[in-house]
């Protein structure tokens, strides 16, 4: 924060994540979601550390890419050109860059290598966590752009017999790099028509996703931290 690009350019921004709260979200929300919607093999690979890292990199991802652009001789914030499509594109961009950033850290040895096998299953469970804030909201549409794109590439499949989704990690670097290029290109050019086309192609929830969400009513959407200092 803050979200105002003029303030960010002039003064910078600050990110704060509380790891104990993130761990509580992982154990109380993300893991129960995964049990309902992911394959048994993927549930076994879940990692609180991968969850924390990808959320951290999501927030960093918001600050990567263009903020102010010039289109047709007019300079303004990216969101002014993408209008109502901006938030969904931006959320999808931040998620996509979170995976690329984390994979980069893995490749550079900055993160333990054994975390890699946990990354895609944890990310996939995280998509279901996020989408529950609202299918029609920016985060929900942004999630479905990623989900449907990755499913098209074969990185996510659905087992009709078990009604569970399966993560396939082969070439995930290539898949996320391709999606990041599409999203960043839209933002760099302020291309409203391309944003609209991408959302129309990938932004709608599938029947399988909708059905999976009906099995999550017993899982909290979020947690409510209680701070002893204000009791």
Residue ranges: model-predicted function:
Residues 1-79:
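Active-site-adjacent "gating/activation" loops or surface patches in catalytic cores
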Residues 46-50, 87-91, 117, 121:
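Solvent-exposed, acidic/flexible segments
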């Amino acid at each position: 924060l803050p979200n105002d690009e003029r303030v960010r350019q002039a003064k910078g921004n600050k990110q704060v994540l509380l790891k104990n709260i993130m761990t509580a979200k992982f154990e109380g929300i993300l893991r129960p979601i995964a049990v309902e919607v992911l394959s048994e093999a993927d549930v076994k690979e879940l990692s609180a550390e991968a969850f924390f890292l990808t959320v951290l990199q999501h927030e960093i991802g918001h600050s990567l890419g263009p903020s102010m652009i010039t289109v047709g001789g007019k300079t303004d914030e990216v969101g002014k050109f993408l209008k109502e499509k901006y938030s969904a594109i931006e959320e999808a961009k931040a998620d996509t860059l979170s995976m690329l950033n984390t994979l980069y850290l893995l490749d550079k040895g900055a993160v333990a290598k054994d975390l890699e096998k946990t990354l895609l299953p944890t990310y996939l469970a995280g998509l279901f966590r996020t989408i529950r804030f609202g299918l029609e909201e920016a985060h929900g549409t942004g999630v479905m752009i990623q989900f449907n794109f990755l499913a098209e590439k074969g990185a996510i499949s659905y087992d009709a017999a078990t009604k569970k989704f399966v993560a396939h990690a082969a070439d995930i670097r290539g898949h996320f790099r391709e999606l990041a290029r599409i999203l960043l290109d839209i933002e760099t050019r302020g291309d409203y028509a391309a944003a609209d086309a991408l959302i129309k192609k990938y932004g709608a929830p599938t029947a399988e996703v909708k059905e999976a969400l009906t099995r999550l009513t017993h899982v909290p959407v979020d947690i409510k931290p209680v701070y002893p200092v204000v009791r």
